[in-house]
Amino acid sequence: MKSFLDSNFLLQSETAQKLYHEHAAKMPIIDYHCHFIPHPIADNYQFADLPEIWLRGDHYKWRAMRANGVPETYITGDKPAYEKFEKWAESLQYAMRNPLYHWTHLELSRIFGIDKVLNPSTAREIYDECTAKLQTPEFRAQAIMERMNVEVVCTTDDPIDDLKYHTQIRQSSLKTKVLPAWRPDKAMAIENVDTYNEYLTKLEAAADMSILNFKNLIDALQKRHDFFASQGCRLSDHGILTFYAEPYTDAEIEAIFLKARMKKELTVEEIDKFRSAMLYEFAVMDAKSDWVQQFHYGATRNNNVRMFKQLGPDTGYDAIGDAEVAAPLARFLSRLDEEGVLAKSIFYNLNPRDNELLMTTIYSFNDGTVPGKMQYGSGWWFLDQIHGMEKQMNALSDLGLLSRFVGMLTDSRSFLSYPRHEYFRRILCNILGREVEDGLLPASELSFIGKMVEDISYNNAKGYFKF
């Protein structure tokens, strides 16, 4: 019987072990998409206890705790820190086979040096040991990043953000590069005209100009885009239900925008036309700046209306959607390609039914200018687990070039999430190692396969994003 989480965890062949230990393990981390708040990094924040660094804002854990019958007061409520942690430890034991079980123990082992299994009987001991370590300089925010060999982190930032904390980080002694990434979702969220107009007021202030018409809107966003570029931004990110590619005229978009400015309710058709125009304009900006654009699509948000009213967004009530994607995605990319403004792009689907659909569509738009120009992104969110990542890499291998893949990202809000890169690398090495052992890949090419592992773990991302 193998030991849990030993040095060969997930590595089920000698070749897999060789690939991981000799090639993957040593590579630095490029975390090109996450949801870290830059303020704690800038301040080199010292976390008070495990719930603050581990449970706060982690809707993965919150969903599991709710499913285990834990009352909300222990999750997002005001119960004492240890009582919240105790409920998490109780729930974790029931979460076997959920990726949370592996992630939790990897984080305890790699960051805190604790190899005990977390359960109700060990909860107090682990809590006390981790909390004591969190009070030391080695566990401040910046120290954790450096200790985990993190070379680059890209945060997720709204166009109105002043990026002052990124400036503060650059001026610090932190070796890790912390760069902004452009996330302009609110600039196209015209479906709620009251909220949208409130946002435009903030955008006017950030861009130092009035926004009276659609051209003003694009000019204001371009000013902010240029500012982000001056601060080292190399990526954009867009959270969308599907790809908006409805036909429209400039006159229609102007009329829709002015109608929204007058706070008149828009039709579904008008909303989709406006979204289509905005998604196109964002893509043009990215292409002209030689950025990489990312598209996370397919989530239905805030499904539980009662809890959304109580807790707000990003609290564990989102799900996999089933919107049509094939035709609008092809229209969207084809227009950009015809106009010569199709930037390097990464696509993340939330519905696994789309794996092959997405791969075959985006690979219709590789143009020979850049290796791996159109990227099929790593398994995202609900697919960020062994089977989801294997399916993503299998679809990428079956229909494209796994060797050109830019690899893993945490997509996380937690400073303890970096072992997910290790998790991914072990899964990658296990896939390749198994196929060498089974004679599906030549053992004589093991040197190249080792280089391939290093590329997917680090080199491809470094070159693709020009970090």
Across the structure, where does each feature detected by a protein language model lie?
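Hard-cation-handling environments
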Residues: 299, 304
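Short glycine/proline- and charge-enriched loop/turn segments
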Residues: 308-316
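C-terminal amphipathic alpha-helical interaction region
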Residues: 293-295
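Metal-cofactor-binding active-site regions of metalloenzymes
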Residues: 2-289, 341-343, 347-359, 363-467
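Short, basic/hydrophobic alpha-helical segments
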Residues: 332-338
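Divalent-cation-assisted or electrostatically stabilized phosphate/pyrophosphate-binding catalytic cores
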Residues: 323-329
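A short acidic, glycine-rich active-site loop
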Residues: 267-268, 317-323
